[in-house]
UniProtKB/Swiss-Prot annotation:
It comes from Brucella anthropi (strain ATCC 49188 / DSM 6882 / CCUG 24695 / JCM 21032 / LMG 3331 / NBRC 15819 / NCTC 12168 / Alc 37) (Ochrobactrum anthropi). Belongs to the MsrA Met sulfoxide reductase family. The active site is at residue 57. Keywords: Oxidoreductase. One of its GO terms (cellular component) is cytoplasm. InterPro entries: Met_Sox_Rdtase_MsrA_dom, Met_Sox_Rdtase_MsrA_sf, MsrA_MetSO_reductase. Has an important function as a repair enzyme for proteins that have been inactivated by oxidation. Catalyzes the reversible oxidation-reduction of methionine sulfoxide in proteins to methionine. SUPFAM superfamilies: Peptide methionine sulfoxide reductase. Residues 1-28 are annotated as: Disordered. Its EC number is 1.8.4.11. This is Peptide methionine sulfoxide reductase MsrA. It is an enzyme of class 1 (oxidoreductase). GO terms for biological process: cellular response to oxidative stress; protein modification process.
Length: 218
């Protein structure tokens, strides 16, 4: 297979027929957060909210959010594709359709979705399509998956605001996918809180240098 064919394969979403079959049972993973000891899969305190962010390699993205005051817990996983219960190796082939994502569970009385979105937009490049820097493939695409209509509206308004800011600097267009949250498949144990376990590990986050003009009124 030529380099061009390999690139095309990794950057095109697979059809249902092309996607890997996956498996019926979830892959083994952690139940508690390595940094704060809180439950990765709930239950979480009443009134707390969730959002899924994809912004390239999930190692650095997860660390970014677990450090935010008001964020209760984070976890990494795969979402937005076809293959049920995929492994990391399967996801990297581009034949699952999933993006690497970070689940962020937060207390909206302490940190707002707008504040989380500001971090999301400023800490990666949302104009790169099916890649993030040197990381190439559908798994590294920019995504926001929300759990209710109000949050989706907030996310879409923030995309519009940041798109205008980027255009003012000659950048864009934004390729970030904003959708209702699909099923999250938790990643393997060694990926959870990876940079806490491996402080010198790879972190590919790099923004555009353009500030995001939010928070917006909710």
């Amino acid at each position: 297979m030529s380099f061009l064919d390999s690139y095309r394969k990794k950057t095109q979403m697979p059809s249902t027929d092309e996607a890997l079959p996956g498996r019926a049972q979830p892959i083994p993973t952690s139940t508690t957060h390595f940094v704060n000891g809180r439950p990765l899969k709930g239950p979480w305190p009443e009134g707390y909210k969730q959002v899924l962010f994809g912004m390239g390699c999930f190692w650095g993205a997860e660390r970014l959010f677990w450090q935010v005051p008001g964020v209760y817990v984070t976890a990494v996983g795969y979402a937005g594709g076809v293959t049920p219960n995929p492994t990391y190796e399967e996801t990297c082939t581009g034949l699952t359709g999933h993006a690497e994502v970070v689940l962020v569970v937060y207390d909206p009385k302490v940190v707002s979705l707008d504040e989380l979105l500001t971090l999301f937009w400023e800490e990666h490049d949302p104009t790169q399509g099916m890649r993030q820097g040197n990381d190439i493939g559908t798994t590294y695409r920019s995504v926001i998956y929300t759990f209710d209509k109000t949050d989706r509206d907030v996310a879409e308004k923030s995309r519009e605001a940041y798109s205008q800011a980027l255009a003012g600097r000659g950048l864009g267009p934004i390729t970030t996918e904003i959708e209702d949250a699909p099923e999250l498949y938790y990643a393997e144990d060694y990926h959870q809180q990876y940079l806490a376990k491996n402080p010198n590990g790879y972190c590919g986050l790099r923004g555009t240098g353009v500030s995001c003009p939010i928070p917006l009124a909710q």
